[in-house]
Amino acid sequence: MNETLVDRNNITLRDRVKSMAASFGLPRLIIAGFLLLLFIAAPFVGADFWTQISNTINRFSWNAIMVLAMVPMIHSGCGLNFGLPLGIISGLLGATLSIEFGFTGPLSFLMAILIATPFAVILGTLYGWLLNKIKGGEMMIATYVGFSSVSFMCMMWLLLPYHSPTMVWGFAGKGLRTTISLEGFYDKVLAGFLQINIGNLSIPTGTLLFFAVLAFGMWAFLHTKTGTAMTAVGSNPTFARAAGVNVDKMRMLSVILSTWLAAIGILVYEQGFGFIQLYMAPFYMALPAVSAILIGGATVNKATIANVIIGTFLFQGIVTMTPTVMNNMIHMDMSEVIRVVASQGMILYALTRKTEATK
């Protein structure tokens, strides 16, 4: 009888472990295990453990909002937002115009957000209108919308009448530079706010709090009447339409919200790195964000805030740690090559995997 009880307990424990593994997702367990292995190996190959933790947290804080921008369109049934560069361009316009108008310090960051917002709303409305016309092929069209908008802006960055000596080419006095320093403007405006420094460990508290506010806002919005209607449109548009929900309006709202979050996301990304990059820089920025949320357990039909947090941390952790550890192990300067292999490999995995959504 005792043996029977032990067997039952063992089965219960085994089932519990299997249930937890299924809930978290086997692919995520493997990636998390590999990331943990990299963290453990770091001190043994000469990489400072706390510095690597800091780098991972910093990269998470810079990229999390752009991954969060995926959530509204997934909920409304528009799929993954491969047109993220539209929102990024809105943010870049806000950033450059804020500097052009002479704003400095934290005020330049606030003004960049305010200026970027109408651009995001206008571009998001046009983008949403287009996606409503081609239902079923949103992700393919979104990809080309993103690529073409970046190429178009390559011309506009040269032609738009900017005059700030901080941004324009020195020899011509017109056309924006490829890279613009944010020193004296909003460099580290969030990362330096309430920053915690303990030895080599540095935690960008301000950036994490800013993301937390936006993430909570998104969670709260999805639980409102409008957010519930948006989710219903994504789950079953026919039922939503029968219930009196304007399907096209909900889809357009999700696109506008996603575009606005992308604009905010690139501004946070810039303040972390300390500079603005124009021209072809936004070209492939949608892919890491798409991959991160998929690795986090989302699908093209379902996504949660937990998917955003877990996916961003895993993706950025692997991209940060793999080059550092491998470079120290083989004692060759191949960090950039390894970084590209790791990041593109993660993107390839995320875009080709077929699994059910996890919590």
Q: In which residue ranges do the predicted regions lie?
A:
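Central hydrophobic cores of alpha-helical transmembrane segments
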Residues: 87-91, 142-148, 305-318
